[in-house]
Structure formats: C-alpha cells, structure tokens
Amino acid sequence: MAHKKGQGSSRNGRDSNPQYRGVKVYGGETVSAGSILVRQVGTVIHAGANVKLGRDFTLYSVVDGVVKYERLGRDRKKVSVYPAAAEQASA
C-alpha cells in the first residue's frame, strides 16, 4: 500500500439529497384533502382536527378546508383544518 496519495485522487465527492422539511402550508390557506401541511422529524407540531400523522411524522389534511395553527397547552403547537363552510359561518 502506498503511503502517499496518487495524483488526482480525491476522497470527497459524496453528498446526500436534501430533505425539504418544514411548514408547507401556512395558517389561513385553503387546502384539499390529502395535502401535506408539515414535513418534520418527530412531533414538533401535533395533529389537530381533521389532520393525520404519517409514519414519517408528516402532517396531512383529511378534509378540504382552511388551515389553522393553534397552541396545545403551554408549550406545544397543533395544526387543524376546518371545513371552509364552517369557517365562513363563524366569520
């Protein structure tokens, strides 16, 4: 085995693809059923009304409606989707 690197050899050049995590839909926006709301690692944001948690902690909408981010207790957050008809009636 040579103790010196040969000319032009490089031990770098590997990289992984980005994960594209974060909030995909913000509060007040309208979504359709199945829309991804948040991509995350662990439950940084919890699932609220009409929102389900995927096996990779992705939060997605179950119904068509308007997104609302709310507090869950003192130090947690949750995201809910309220049907658009109910949202207009309360406004």
From Swiss-Prot:
Q: Where is this region: Disordered?
A: 1-22
The UniProt transmembrane annotation reads none
Q: What cellular-component terms does GO give this entry?
A: cytosolic large ribosomal subunit
Instruction: Please give one Pfam family short name.
Output: Ribosomal_L27
**GO MF, one example:** structural constituent of ribosome
Give the GO biological process terms.
translation
The alphabetized UniProt keywords are: Ribonucleoprotein, Ribosomal protein
Q: Could you say which residues form the signal peptide?
A: none
- Check the record and name the InterPro entries matching this protein: Ribosomal_bL27
Bias kind Polar residues: ranges: 7-19
The similarity annotation says: Belongs to the bacterial ribosomal protein bL27 family.
Q: What protein name does the entry list? A: Large ribosomal subunit protein bL27
Gene that this sequence comes from: rpmA
